[in-house]
Amino acid sequence: MRFDGRGAESLREVKITRNYLKHAEGSVLIEFGDTKVICTASVEGSVPPFLRGKGTGWVTAEYSMLPRATHTRSHRESSKGKVGGRTHEIQRLIGRSLRAVMDMNLLGERSVLIDCDVIQADGGTRTASITGAYVALYDALDGLVKKGELAAMPLKEAVAAVSVGIVDGTPLLDLNYVEDSSAEVDMNFVMTSSNRFVEVQGTAEAEPFTVEQMDAMRDLAISGIKRLFQIQKEALCQ
């Protein structure tokens, strides 16, 4: 039993609130326990220079964290004049994950800009961002389809992500901050709804992990992500 009462194979309570912001074409508040992220999808009628004239679209992402999303205040990256390495890595991961399930030809020469803003962090912010950003992206694209601006939905399938790790020798699903900070192994899995992997990230913080431990974490991730697909589907049906 974990300190928050969950079993090893349990997700935190996950909530997805759609249409959270007034102006964005797609927006959600996603909550993984005490981790809360606002994800928006904004549609622009142009593409980056390297795609101009090719008849294909683009999806990209930015990620940030409010200064007091964490236990102590962090400095805004804008005040430093540059994006940090961690932020750059996470926003590239979010963009890759969403592009993996898109048919860019159906999007035409449009861009969708995803913004993931962490308003409260308790572990798993990147995986929550991916899971929520998919729903925001779906809503933005569905709006274009309903207005007749797109002939068909460019999203081919769903994508979601979850963290897993080993804490005190036990594989755990969906780590919160306390668990993540003391984990011997920390992994993130990104999967599509056709049971294919987009990305697997894993690091041994202490002892190297075995193939058997890797398999156990993979199985936890697969079961957790299947549940996340169901939560996404339920949110989109509301």
Swiss-Prot record:
Keywords: Nucleotidyltransferase, RNA-binding, rRNA processing, Transferase, tRNA processing, tRNA-binding
Origin superkingdom: Bacteria
First-tier enzyme category under EC: transferase
EC number, UniProt record: 2.7.7.56
GO terms for MF: 3'-5'-RNA exonuclease activity; tRNA binding; tRNA nucleotidyltransferase activity
Repeat recorded as keyword: no
Subunit: Homohexameric ring arranged as a trimer of dimers.
Name of the molecule in the record: Ribonuclease PH
